[in-house]
Every structure is written in C-alpha cells, then in structure tokens.
Amino acid sequence: MTATAQQLEFLKNSIQSIPDYPKPGILFRDVTSLLEDPKAYALSIELLVERYRHAGITKVVGTEARGFLFGAPVALGLGVGFVPVRKPGKLPRKTFAEDYALEYGTDTLELHCDAIQPGDVVLVVDDLLATGGTIEATVNLIRRAGGSVKDAAFIINLFDLSGEARLKALGVESYSLVSFPGH
C-alpha cells in the first residue's frame, strides 16, 4: 500500500501540538497522541513496513526511547532483527559509544558492538527528525560496527530545523510520514 494523502492527513491530525512546551515559544509535536490511537499507530507502522519491504534491509535500529516504539514493530513487519541504541550504561555487553552535541552540552549514545555485522543494511527508525544530532550519532555507531545505513525513517520531520540536510551530508536519505515547521 502506498501512502495516500488522506492517510497522511489522518496521521498528521492524530499528532497533538502543545504550545509553550517544554518552554515558552516552543510548539511541541506530541507523537504520543498518535500512539494512543490504535488505527493511527498501526497505519504508521504499516506504511513504513510497506515502503521498506523490498529494500534489502537486514536490521532496524531505533534510538532511545521513542525510536523503540516505532522501530521494533517495523522490524517485525520486515522480518528482521531490531537493534536498540541507548543512553550510556543501559546495554550489558561491550558497546561502541558516540558523543553528540545538544543545544546546551553533550550526550552519548551506545550500541552493542556485536549487534550490527559488516554487510548489514540498516534502516534507522525514530519518531522525530529535528536538527539531526541524535540520528547522526546513531548513523556513526552503525558505521563503526560495519553496517551501512540504507535510510532513516521518521514519523515527524520538523522541516525547517535542518535535519534532512544533515543526513544528506552523511549520505543518508530520509523519509518522514508527516512534516511540520519547527518552532
């Protein structure tokens, strides 16, 4: 099934916009409202699975935490393994770590060293693309493990925050079900 304009509008309307959260001047796009609607949640997964069904994906990677909510069911739909990328100290085996910049400071993400094998073709799935910092760190981890990133898929793209351009500079195509301006 290819996404129709009506389906995408349904998904977009299922995402609540919360003004002045987490601080004044921000219009927060709340993907949890999509998760609360079983039809919207199922449709978002179905559309992503259909898009990547014949893309040769061997692993799906999701970034903590909401990337797990979308990435794991997409992996099941594709019949491939799901690999979590987590915050430091949450994975029990040996990990690769990647620091990345936040608006104020830095953070770190980790990936099990043996979760991605050389030659794996990886789809990264997350809930939202904004500036692309988290996804860039995730892509770097996958590449360090020997995998290649086929695409990065999102439910929401905040199109004016440069995340798509950042991914393109890394040689990664991005796809989003819906787009909003970022505030």
Curated annotation (Swiss-Prot):
SUPFAM superfamilies: PRTase-like
Keywords: Cytoplasm, Glycosyltransferase, Purine salvage, Transferase
Main localization category: cytoplasm
Domain of life (superkingdom): Bacteria
Gene Ontology molecular function: any one: adenine binding
Protein EC: 2.4.2.7
InterPro entries membership: Ade_phspho_trans, PRibTrfase_dom, PRTase-like, UPRTase/APRTase
GO CC terms: cytoplasm
Top EC group: transferase
Subcellular location: Cytoplasm
Catalytic activity: AMP + diphosphate = 5-phospho-alpha-D-ribose 1-diphosphate + adenine
Listed GO biological process terms: adenine salvage; AMP salvage; purine ribonucleoside salvage
Oligomer and partners: Homodimer.
Family per similarity comment: Belongs to the purine/pyrimidine phosphoribosyltransferase family.
Role description: Catalyzes a salvage reaction resulting in the formation of AMP, that is energically less costly than de novo synthesis.
The name this protein goes by in its record: Adenine phosphoribosyltransferase
